[in-house]
């Protein structure tokens, strides 16, 4: 029976329902325990191991997530991708990231991959996590101090389109009596140089926009983690992070009308940001089968910026703050592993925006949002015989919002997960969960962001909708897994999701400018088939491993008896790659190719149709152990020189009146690393 296993597991970690799986590859080294955990645990949770996060030369956590299956990061159309702004909820050590302003970058850009222990991806909700998990949950787990003393230093340098890139990472960890500690620091200084083009055909005129952009991003991150263990039953931890950054970019936009240069617009954007995270937590083993945990947290992200576009100047200040407390109680009893918990959290967000045109103030707007959320949950992992584990749960959340006018809503989010072991090496999994997505501040605010002097279909002004309602979804998932004897896996699965009050963003032409606003469009359905293969080929070629995964998806949105796809739903995407280790030379090298399929959206309610071509990215890496202390590496990134091409068409009374084609280009770049461990 599984009862002894549950008793031992809860004593040490009390997280019995976590599945560990490497998403992108099978390491040639021994990861037998990783595969075994996937076979045994009841709630599917994919995990990218720490050693995978640095080998492809990603400079920060945001770049890491862009190559992670199951994570939604919009790209193209001149809009900066940022996870957490869509349907995928991104957490850092279980805490929601500070989303700050839609005008500024993500705090994930300040997290070095060297700080990350693993990334967990869960594609369906469970009671233990937030109900706002409509597109799944990504949890970035930061490293904890090791028991033995260790010093790590890493230097990275490279070139992107003739522009320098550099970063330095240093970490010290160890243990002194009952106190374990870890301190690390990261400094990054990266520049870039890109170009893009826009072709607008609006008879009788044809407009070409050619944009050359240069930028520089600098960031310093200081982090500490302390763990105090006075006895075998009690543990306290304190985490603190301070990050500062500044970002400067400038661009020249040359505009040609019917082949003649008609205008040149100089754009400049400068910003500074400060991020502060603190957390105090405790674990108390009440008995060999009971554990109580608590946590106090304070997070704040502050940024201010200045944007100049032609004769227009905009100042913006943003503040995002989270204060909260939570506690949980876990108990293993017979064939049950029960966990209950409660959470209180206050979120405060504010934005101040001042706009001047030719030196004259044209607007001065202030946006405020305060949200109080209380949550209760209960979850039970039930072992039924030798082959079945059932995990029911329910979560209740009560949300109070003050945004000009007050609003209050509450909801239940039940979930059910099933694991059935068909044989020693075959699993069948199924789950059903109810989730929600609450509108963000920028989606509610009716103030218009018009920071660009000239706008177009793909670069509109942005406004919100104060009448926006939350989305609610019911998600079904099923998956079959087969585990090879030689540390590999093949799986096939899929999900079906029904979404009420789906939020879609629609663009209209108002007063000669395009404005994009969110609306509750109707009932949506999204379904997908997912396949995965990871295999060690060591029996054929020593040290060789392959990996691959693919997702095929489709969608529909019903509004007033008419149907169309959900906007921007890619037809498919896939990842393939190979890794090879030459043990005699202490050398590992590999390649990975990621392709994102396009989409073709028909005309929406406002007469706008949009399509995007698929694009692929090829990366190569090699690393060599020089001796017991040093390791060197080289990364060739984006060898395909990716171009994202988006075509947008505007119709009036059924007739095509405007076509716009945007091309955003990115260049190959090379990175060199030297890492030492003492």
Please tell me what each predicted stretch does:
Residues 37, 45, 62-100:
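Extracytoplasmic beta-strand/coil segments of soluble accessory domains associated
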Residues 490-499, 509-510, 515-603:
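Gram-negative outer-membrane beta-barrel transporters
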Residues 223-245, 267-405, 411, 421-423, ...:
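Face-selective signature of the C-terminal outer-membrane beta-barrel domain
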Residues 26-56, 84-89:
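N-terminal periplasmic "start-of-domain" segments of outer-membrane beta-barrel proteins
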Residues 595-600, 623-678:
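C-terminal beta-signal and adjacent terminal beta-strands/loops
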Residues 269-275, 365-373, 407, 427, ...:
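Outer-membrane beta-barrel signature, preferentially recognizing the C-terminal barrel domain
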Residues 61-64, 90-91, 106-109, 121, ...:
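N-terminal periplasmic accessory domains that precede
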Residues 95-123, 170:
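Short acidic/polar hinge/loop motifs at secondary-structure boundaries
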